[in-house]
């Protein structure tokens, strides 16, 4: 089921507030504005953000420090406290730590650091942006 993309970040905020999920995943290509959107949502919703870039060990293929990532996410969720996780291939990272997002935001657009082949395969497998709860066309303040 393809969901209609939202046009403004305040509309996204309203929809998230209505659902108030525990785990929000923000996905999209590199350099598209995921971190900026995550920071804005964290500020608006009063919840922390876990940036996958901080847990990277390799770019080709992308790999994370999964034990550390799991610990960071689990500490919030085990206490029933919300958390935002953002980054390229975020759904794969969450799979590796046995977590599922309650709410997925996909930031659409063209990325920048040469992960194109891996991203195309990932988007096909994950059916993004169509399977996301919401899809933005880039994020700009």
Each predicted region: which residue ranges?
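Conserved glycine(s) of the Walker
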Residues: 33
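Active-site signature of alpha/beta-hydrolase-fold catalytic machinery across serine-
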Residues: 40
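Hydrophobic positions on the alpha1 helix immediately C-terminal to the Walker A/P-loop
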Residues: 37
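P-loop (Walker A) phosphate-binding loop of NTP-binding proteins
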Residues: 29
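Hydrophobic anchor at the beta1->P-loop junction of P-loop NTPases
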Residues: 26
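N-terminal pre-Walker A segment at the start of P-loop NTPase domains
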Residues: 1-19
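Conserved nucleotide-sensing/catalytic segment adjacent to the nucleotide-binding pocket
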Residues: 47-101
């Amino acid at each position: 089921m393809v969901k209609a993309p939202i046009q403004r970040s305040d509309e996204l905020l309203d929809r998230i507030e209505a659902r108030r999920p525990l785990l929000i995943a923000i996905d999209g290509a590199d350099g598209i504005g995921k971190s900026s959107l995550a920071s804005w949502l964290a500020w608006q919703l009063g919840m922390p953000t876990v940036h996958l870039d901080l847990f990277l060990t390799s770019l080709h293929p992308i790999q994370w420090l999964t034990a550390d990532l799991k610990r960071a996410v689990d500490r919030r969720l085990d206490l029933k406290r919300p958390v935002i996780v953002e980054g390229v291939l975020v759904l794969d990272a969450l799979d590796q730590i046995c977590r599922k997002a309650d709410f997925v935001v996909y930031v659409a657009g063209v990325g920048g650091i040469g992960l194109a082949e891996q991203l195309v395969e990932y988007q096909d497998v994950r059916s993004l942006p169509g399977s996301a709860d919401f899809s933005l066309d880039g994020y700009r303040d």
